């Protein structure tokens, strides 16, 4: 069966974002390569060679990948989707939601809904939209 993994684009903040996600999600950053370190170094303007060409964060066997934009076109940000993380406990979901929200914008606080033990939405400080969910069938801790 095929797996769907996300690939994000940033405007010069990829390294900081991926290190942040590594800490928040307790993953393992497997690759963080700049354009300057790659065979494509001469294809990129010198001032953009320190940008990230490819980053890969392992999240328990799944991948969150990213790079920095190097196009001369204006960067329009991350739009039109949200990344969804599903947890088995409300406590873990709350920890992640709180850490992701630091410096970001909460769109919907993490709370019980008619479809979930907990659900919340936010945009983190790097502009990435997130949905944090705990399925109703998961045993909410403390209840």
Where in the sequence are the language-model features?
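Core segments of cupin and vicinal oxygen chelate
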Residues: 8-61
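Vicinal oxygen chelate
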Residues: 2, 30-33, 58, 65-76, ...
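Short, solvent-exposed loop/turn segments at the edges of secondary structure
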Residues: 52, 78-80
């Amino acid at each position: 069966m095929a797996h769907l993994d996300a690939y994000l684009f940033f405007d010069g903040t990829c390294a900081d974002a991926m290190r942040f996600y590594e800490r928040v999600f307790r993953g393992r950053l497997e690759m963080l390569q700049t354009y300057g370190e790659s065979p494509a170094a001469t294809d990129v303007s010198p001032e953009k060679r320190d940008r990230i060409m490819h980053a890969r964060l392992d999240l328990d066997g799944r991948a969150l990948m990213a790079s920095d934009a190097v196009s001369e076109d204006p960067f329009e940000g991350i739009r039109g989707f949200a990344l969804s993380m599903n947890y088995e406990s409300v406590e873990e979901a709350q920890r992640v939601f709180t850490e992701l929200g630091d410096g970001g914008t909460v769109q919907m606080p993490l709370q019980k809904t008619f479809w979930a033990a907990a659900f919340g939405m936010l945009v983190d400080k790097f502009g990435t939209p997130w949905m944090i969910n705990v399925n109703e069938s998961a045993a909410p801790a403390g209840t």
